[in-house]
Amino acid sequence: MVVLSTLALVRAAYSLNSFVFEAEDIRFGSPWWFVVVGVACFLVLFAGIMSGLTLGLMSLGLVELEILQQSGSSAEKKQAAAILPVVKKQHQLLVTLLLCNAAAMEALPICLDKIFHPFVAVLLSVTFVLAFGEIIPQAICSRYGLAVGANFLWLVRILMIICYPIAYPIGKVLDAVIGHNDTLFRRAQLKALVSIHSQEAGKGGELTHEETMIISGALDLSQKTAEEAMTPIESTFSLDVNTKLDWETIGKILSRGHSRIPVYLGNPKNIIGLLLVKSLLTVRAETEAPVSSVSIRKIPRVPSDMPLYDILNEFQKGSSHMAAVVKVKDKDKKNNMQLLSNGETPKENMKFYQSSNLTAPLLKHESHDVVVDIDKVPKHVKNRGRNFQQNGTVTRDLPCLLEDNEDAEVIGIITLEDVFEELLQAEIVDETDVYIDVHKRVRVAAAAAAAVSSITRASPAEIQSKVGQTVKKLVGKEARGTKNYTTKITEPLLAESDR
């Protein structure tokens, strides 16, 4: 536009003989003079509409229109639904609007040249086009582009039909060369968009800090791995399969407050299953039965680089809420990286994880009565069986699943709560937790610590009374036998607290 105006000024300078306000073709005040002025005003208005629609419609992306069509107000839904089919023809629409805008701006100086001197005509055309054909329309359409585009959609459709012979071929060429602009947001862009809409950003957003944290955690869930969220095996409370379920062991289980406890054989890294604490309700502590006498359920194994999103999907099936994290072999790591480089989604990667010889896939379509047969050695275990002597009990051909196999050792335990903590990006602390962050060894709040210290300072009679009530609820005994039970369970606890 600036180039055209410059050329017109040069042309006017060469043809200027005298500064006359009125041209000789059409006299001022004649009917034709008013007709030309009306045409000039129409051209300015038409050029302004085309300029505003170019900015308003082309600034509306397909993704934005689809969002408004689904989640906008009733008026926005109607407007977005009407505009979307037209905006999908991006390049044809662009060529149509630019052709009409250029035609109006080129015709304006010609009309004004009939009633004004060429120099005055160029000066007026540049002024009116800038003010009423560019600045004001684009300022309005940049703010109300959706509403303006919907109201002038009938005009746009007519112009697209008129300019079809020229706009359609050029639009197809642009589609082939440039392509369509329908890029979606990346994860980082979505997180930044959510953070901008938070109340803490101070930009009028309605999302609270907790809501933004949860949304960001959900976006990061497929990027985080099991190794990042697991509890290290060294910090995990577990039981040997030959441990006697006496009062001391039951007291430790009660003090931990876990609902599921991993069970190992010989080496704590040799996890063979898990024990549901509620299954101990029928166990009599005076019999000192080993853990192997209770139903030990299968514990699924997942590779350390498995995304938390896939683990959450498997936990949702209800087969298990605890899994053993296994160290991935270098060979399987390379295969996994090759799968990721091929652009496969996390769901497609599940095929790799489930077929890996390091892991046992999470239980599917199995009832909760499935237990581990500790007398049967799995086929994939190289060490068929070994004899262990612990607590005076000798095991018979119990499988050593992962011992002496450094590439497939269990390095941690992951639970559904761990995945939820990564989703919420905050630690979930209950009344039995000792540490908020197991990795950093950060203890719980002072209130919980004070409660623990108050129990430690309590008298033996008070401790026996409290533990007796708990044992009575668990084992279902009458009050007459509670005293003997509490004496047996509190003696080792008191001895340990005196240390």
Curated annotation (Swiss-Prot):
Residues covered by the CNNM transmembrane domain: 29-211
Main location, first listed in the record: membrane
Membrane-related topology note: Multi-pass membrane protein
KW GTP-binding (keyword) present: no
TM stretches of this protein: 33-53, 92-112, 115-135, 146-166
InterPro entries: ACDP, CBS_dom_sf, CNNM, Ion_transp-like_CBS
Alphabetically ordered keywords of this record: CBS domain, Glycoprotein, Membrane, Repeat, Transmembrane, Transmembrane helix
Pfam families linked to this entry: CNNM
Positions on the Extracellular side per record topology: 1-32, 113-114, 167-499
GO CC entries: membrane
Domain CBS: start-end pairs: 230-291, 295-359, 365-431
Domain of life from the UniProt record: Eukaryota
Keyword Oxidoreductase included in the entry's annotation: no
Carbohydrate-modified residues: N181, N357, N391, N484
GO BP of this protein: magnesium ion homeostasis
Cysteines engaged in disulfide bonds, as pairs: none
Localization terms from the record: Membrane
UniProt topological domain (Cytoplasmic) ranges: 54-91, 136-145
Stated name of the protein: Putative DUF21 domain-containing protein At1g03270
Organism ancestry: Eukaryota, Viridiplantae, Streptophyta, Embryophyta, Tracheophyta
Gene, per the UniProt record: CBSDUF4
